[in-house]
Regions:
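Bacterial N-terminal signal peptides that target proteins for export
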Residues: 1-11
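Non-catalytic cap/lid and distal C-terminal segments of serine-dependent acyl enzymes
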Residues: 19-328
């Protein structure tokens, strides 16, 4: 084998190892258990079920997990608030169960800290839940396909006051983006260790994270990345662009991050806190001890879920049974 061929193989091997290592570094860490699923058409109340719907926006089936409240079958005239939960990078709709979030919510409910609501977690690939410049339209898949389908198919109250969105890591970007672009649709937005990116990565950056982010962002914002498109789909800028509508909606904002976040996301989260303060936008922000990922989220989940539940309660409609709509 000649010298040039050996060099080419060596460089290719390093590149493959680099991307694999960074992908593993960015994936939220926690041991995964095999999810338990049911073959029934409707979810078992209190348990997690997996389903899908045809999505025009992404040109294929949009998979999702759904959890119905324990009283769903027993109290057949009652409608419920709904939470849309967005997973992080390298995840899918099953993360919500196998990473322990569903169990954490059930525990909070059993302890009387929160009440009953429906939870839906769609599969978002590594899309950042936006309409990619040259790819799939995940913002439209959620806003135009998923939410109408869920609220037609299940007994959801279906008012902005009883609809919430939440995300972890990359899903935090997505939750904030969708909430700020469509503030009239949600009562609350809550995030844990949101993957906020205040600027495009330096194309000359040689560190592993910069190179991986450049590769990822190129698939979403164009190659080379389109700066204007990046700002138009970045919650750190969208909040300013749509500030009047956000304030008018009265949407409640909560976010937190670990002080020892291994991706350094505590810094852009702190900057985001400062920006919202300067914009005069009410919000709640916390830095808690902890790293990045699912284990961190579970350790502080009571803060965000009590926050969204208290805002659901402010509407009052879920505290008593709501009569079924005609034709249900």
């Amino acid at each position: 084998m000649d010298l040039l061929m050996q060099l080419a193989i060596g460089i290719l091997s390093v590149m493959i190892t680099l991307v694999a290592n960074v992908a593993a570094h960015l994936m939220p860490r926690q041991a995964a258990a095999t999810p338990q699923t049911s073959s029934s058409a409707q979810p078992t109340p209190g348990g997690v079920q997996y389903s899908s719907l045809p999505s025009e926006a992404i040109g294929k089936e949009l998979k999702f997990a759904i959890v119905l409240p324990p009283s769903y079958e027993r109290d057949t005239k009652r409608r419920y608030p709904v939470l849309y939960f967005l997973h992080g990078m390298n995840g899918n709709e099953r993360e919500f169960e196998r990473r322990g979030v569903a169990a954490a919510i059930s525990k909070l409910r059993d302890e009387g800290k929160i009440g009953e609501f429906i939870i839906v977690s769609p599969a978002g690939e590594n899309s950042f839940y936006l309409n990619a410049k040259n790819g799939l339209r995940y913002e439209d898949a959620i806003i135009k396909d998923l939410i109408p389908y869920i609220e037609k198919t299940y007994r959801v109250i279906g008012t902005p006051a009883t609809r919430s969105i939440q995300g972890i890591s990359m899903g935090g970007w997505g939750a904030l983006l969708l909430a700020f672009k469509h503030p009239e649709m949600f009562s609350t937005v809550t995030t844990h260790c949101a993957a906020l990116v205040p600027a495009l990565p330096n194309p000359q950056g040689t560190d592993r994270r910069s190179q991986f982010m450049l590769q990822l962002i190129g698939r979403i914002f164009g190659d080379p990345p389109d700066e204007a498109y990046f700002r138009a789909a970045n919650p750190m800028f969208v909040v300013e662009q749509n500030l009047a509508a956000i304030k008018k909606s009265g949407i409640k904002i909560y976010f937190d991050c670990g002080e020892q976040d291994r991706l350094g996301l505590q810094e852009p989260n702190k900057a985001f806190d400062e920006k919202l303060t300067k914009l005069g936008l009410a919000h709640e922000f916390h830095l808690f001890p902890g790293n990045h990922g699912w284990e961190y989220m579970i350790s502080v989940a009571d803060h965000s879920y009590m926050f969204l539940w208290n805002n659901f309660k402010a509407d009052g409609k879920h505290t008593t049974p709501v009569r079924s709509r005609a034709g249900d």
